[in-house]
Structures are given as structure tokens and as C-alpha cells.
UniProtKB/Swiss-Prot annotation:
Widely expressed with higher expression in testis and skin. Associates with the phosphatase 2A holoenzyme. Interacts with PPP2CA; the interaction is direct. Interacts with DVL1 (via PDZ domain); the interaction is direct and regulated by oxidative stress. Keywords: Acetylation, Cytoplasm, Developmental protein, Differentiation, NAD, Nucleus, Oxidoreductase, Wnt signaling pathway. Residues 167-314 form the Thioredoxin domain. One of its GO terms (molecular function) is thioredoxin-disulfide reductase (NADPH) activity. GO terms for biological process: cell differentiation; circulatory system development; in utero embryonic development; negative regulation of protein ubiquitination; negative regulation of Wnt signaling pathway; Wnt signaling pathway. Belongs to the nucleoredoxin family. InterPro entries: NRX_PDI_b, Thioredoxin-like_fold, Thioredoxin-like_sf, Thioredoxin_domain, TryX_NRX_thioredoxin_dom. This is Nucleoredoxin. It is found in: Cytoplasm, Cytosol; Nucleus.
Length: 435
């Protein structure tokens, strides 16, 4: 177990009091679950979370005192046998060391050392963290993600009765009545044999309302084509009145607004960090894509439904948002040449498929997304923003969160060059240039 933890966290962590702790010792203590707490001292929501998380942490570990100073920083000799084998590690985005020190001082758990900035960025990218505070629970033995939305765990299970909060099958989580906007109620068993879109949305969110208008047409086209497809609206509205107003525009099903527990469990199951989000499931309840929003906007006629992920995407206005989700390989080409974009996709597809398959076997998300970019206004803006040369073809890896780029500017790009470039990046052999 300690091998995984050391690979993830490095050799040393620190307590709130500044004492170093060997990561290897976590394995010896039999930690079953690791919580990664992504936050920042300047964030008011993070300050609020730290207080409630300290009480939660103390209760689950069975510490004599659940407040600041108990637990990790209190000394191993005096620490009681934990009721639940849980450890939390704070991963900060602070830019000022003094502010970081003041913030972690009262934390009863451990923290990644301030100087480990590169490792912090790797963790943010690895787990696709898009906002703070964020709390992700991992199996400390296998490294597999157990729960992406630990904030809801704290709210929904403050006593830790459902520990270790592992994912449950969709059919189990969705079980219960579903509504149509005419008041008709259907059992969730009516979904059997259908592809399902789980739609997290709210009326107060303008991008949600825009997507809903498009999604209504997509839903109609898919149904008219004879496909077995249903959408379930999981509301994030702030009142039942707002929910009813918004739901009146939707021809599909919804989890009742009053069933807050089921709505929360669905958010936990899919680790929802923002809306709108459309998760598309196969008839067995397995995730086909988490990028339903992008797929619907890119495929107006729904010809590619149910939108199985493509190893290489053609960069567009609707999927450019994915550039912010982690490192992306982008091959810029001269799209004025007939067939250039398709040839470029075929060029990088083998290595993309190889990387995706490798990480899928480990039940992890691939560490890179793969794009081909032609010539249009959006691509020009991307080149300008990242200060890239106008050359084509141009092979790059862009890491927006780290504000870093890696450029392979050669006359001819071959599959071997692409594979070497990707492998060197993953092995951290490439020197980044600032964006």
C-alpha cells in the first residue's frame, strides 16, 4: 500500500504543527481510506469546510477531541485506535507560504508540504479538480477513487455510518418513483433496457437553460429514430417552485424535488462539480460518457448517439472547455488542405488508444486528452493565448492549469515522434515553457 501512497504523495507530509511525517508510516498504520482535500486559505468556503471537516474527521477516527489539534498532529503514541481507518491530506493552491502556514496550523490532518508545488499540480490534474473546496476519497490500497464528492458525504453522513462510501450501482441509487411534468409517476424500473441521460441542471443557471433548449430537440430526434432513451433531471434548483417552472419545459423524467437524499446520492455517485452536466449511461447503467453536454452540442442531428468517446477529438467551440480539465495533446494542422484533419487524427489515434486502454485497465482516467486543431477563429485565439508559432503541423501538449506548454516543432510528424513525445511527457522528461 505504501508504494502507491509514496508515488502519489511523495516521501514526506507535514502536520499542522510543522512536523514531518513519513508517508510510508501511513501504510503501517493500516489506513483504509485517503481523503484529498483541495483548498486555499483565501477561500471563505474552504475556511467553513475546514471547521466542519475537523469535527467529521475526529468523529470517524474516534479521537478524544474532534477539534483543531486532535489527530494527526497530536502525536502517534497518544493516538487512540481509529474507529475508521481514515486519513486526510490537504492539497493547497496557496501562493503565499505564510498564509498557507496560518491556514494549516489548526488542521488535525496532514498536508502536502508547501514546497511540493509540482506534485500539487499533478494531483489537481490527475483528479480533474475544477473548483475548491473539493474532497476526494481514495482507496488507500489500490488508489481507486471511491467518492469524488466528499463534501456531500460530510453533509449526508456526518456520523460515518456508510463508511467507506464506495460507489453503488446506478439502479440501486435511482430506485424509487420518477416524475413527468404532468404529475404522472413512474417507477425507476421503467428505465430497464434504455440508455439513460442523467441531467444535472438548474433554472438559475443560464448555461443550463441554453443546453436544455438544445437537449429537448436532441431528445425528440433520438426518440423519433426509435432509440430506447430516457433522461432524468436531477435538480439543483433553490426552491420547489423554481424546479416546477424549469421542469415544465422538459419532456423527460425527474427525481422528485422533495427527494433531496436521492438527488444528493446521484451527485455523489458521479462526483458532480458543476452544472450543466449530462452523464450518458448504457442499458446496464455503466457510464458511456461524462461529456454529454459537449456531445449534444457537437452532434446536432444525434447521428453518433449514444456518443461513445472518441480517442481523438477535433477541437471546436463546444469542446474547447475540455482544454481546462487537464493536460491535452493538440496537433495543429493546416485544415485548408483536403483531408488534413482526418489524416492527423489517424496519425495520433494509435497512441491515444494505447494510453486510454492502459489507464482504463487501472480504472483511472487517461492523463491526456487528444485533439486535432484546424484553422479557425477559436484555434487562432488558442495560439495567441498560448503564444504558439504559426507553424503547421505543430505538435503540442498544453497544460492550462499549470500554465505550461510543451512544443515539438518538426517538419514531419510521425507516429513514432508522437509516441516518444507523449511518453517523455508522462515520464516528466520534457521541459515546460510558460504560457
Amino acid at each position: 500500500m505504501s508504494g502507491f501512497l509514496e508515488e502519489l504523495l511523495g516521501d514526506k507530509l507535514v502536520t499542522g504543527g510543522g512536523e514531518e511525517v513519513d508517508v510510508h508510516s501511513l501504510g503501517a498504520r493500516g489506513i483504509a481510506l485517503l481523503g484529498l482535500y483541495f483548498g486555499c486559505s483565501l477561500s471563505a468556503p474552504c475556511a467553513q469546510l475546514s471547521a466542519s471537516l475537523a469535527a467529521f474527521y475526529g468523529r470517524l477516527r474516534g479521537d478524544a477531541a474532534a477539534g483543531p489539534g486532535a489527530g494527526a498532529g497530536a502525536g502517534a503514541a497518544a493516538e487512540p485506535e481509529p474507529r475508521h481507518r481514515l486519513e486526510i491530506v490537504f492539497v493547497s493552491s496557496d501562493q503565499d507560504q505564510r498564509q498557507w502556514q496560518d491556514f494549516v496550523r489548526d488542521m488535525p490532518w496532514l498536508a502536502l508540504p508547501y514546497k511540493e508545488k509540482h506534485r500539487k499540480l499533478k494531483l489537481w490534474n490527475k483528479y480533474r479538480v475544477s473548483n475548491i473546496p473539493s474532497l476526494i476519497f481514495l482507496d488507500a490500497t489500490t488508489g481507486k477513487v471511491v467518492c469524488r464528492n466528499g463534501l456531500l458525504v460530510i453533509r449526508d453522513d456526518p456520523e460515518g455510518l456508510e463508511f467507506p462510501w464506495g460507489p453503488k450501482p446506478f439502479r440501486e441509487v435511482i430506485a424509487g418513483p420518477l416524475l413527468r411534468n404532468n404529475g404522472q409517476s413512474l417507477e425507476s424500473s421503467s428505465l430497464e433496457g434504455s440508455h439513460v441521460g442523467v441531467y444535472f441542471s438548474a433554472h438559475w443557471c443560464p448555461p443550463c437553460r441554453s443546453l436544455t433548449r438544445v437537449l429537448v430537440e436532441s431528445y425528440r430526434k433520438i426518440k423519433e429514430a426509435g432509440q430506447e432513451f430516457e433522461i432524468i433531471f436531477v435538480s439543483a434548483d433553490r426552491s420547489e417552485e423554481s424546479f416546477k417552472q424549469y421542469f415544465s419545459e422538459m419532456p423527460w423524467l425527474a427525481v422528485p424535488y422533495t427527494d433531496e437524499a436521492r438527488r444528493s446520492r446521484l451527485n455523489r455517485l458521479y462526483g458532480i462539480q458543476g452544472i450543466p452536466t449530462l452523464i450518458v449511461l448504457d442499458p446496464q447503467g455503466e457510464v458511456i460518457t461524462r461529456q454529454g453536454r459537449v456531445e449534444v452540442l457537437n452532434d446536432e442531428d444525434c447521428r453518433e448517439f449514444p456518443w461513445h468517446p472518441k480517442p481523438v477529438l477535433e477541437l471546436s467551440d463546444s469542446n474547447a472547455v475540455q482544454l481546462n480539465e487537464g493536460p491535452c495533446l493538440v496537433l495543429f494542422v493546416d485544415s485548408e488542405d483536403d483531408g488534413e484533419s482526418e489524416a492527423a487524427k489517424q496519425l495520433i489515434q494509435p497512441i491515444a488508444e494505447k494510453i486510454i486502454a492502459k489507464y482504463k485497465a487501472k480504472e483511472e482516467e487517461a492523463p491526456l486528452l487528444f485533439f486535432v486543431a484546424g484553422e479557425d477563429d477559436m484555434t487562432d485565439s488558442l495560439r495567441d493565448y498560448t503564444n504558439l508559432p504559426e507553424a503547421a503541423p505543430l505538435l503540442t501538449i498544453l497544460d492550462m492549469s499549470a500554465r505550461a506548454k510543451y512544443v515539438m516543432d518538426v517538419e514531419e510528424i510521425t507516429p513514432a515522434i508522437v509516441e516518444t513525445f507523449v511518453n517523455d511527457f508522462l515520464a516528466e522528461k520534457l521541459k515546460p515553457e510558460p504560457i
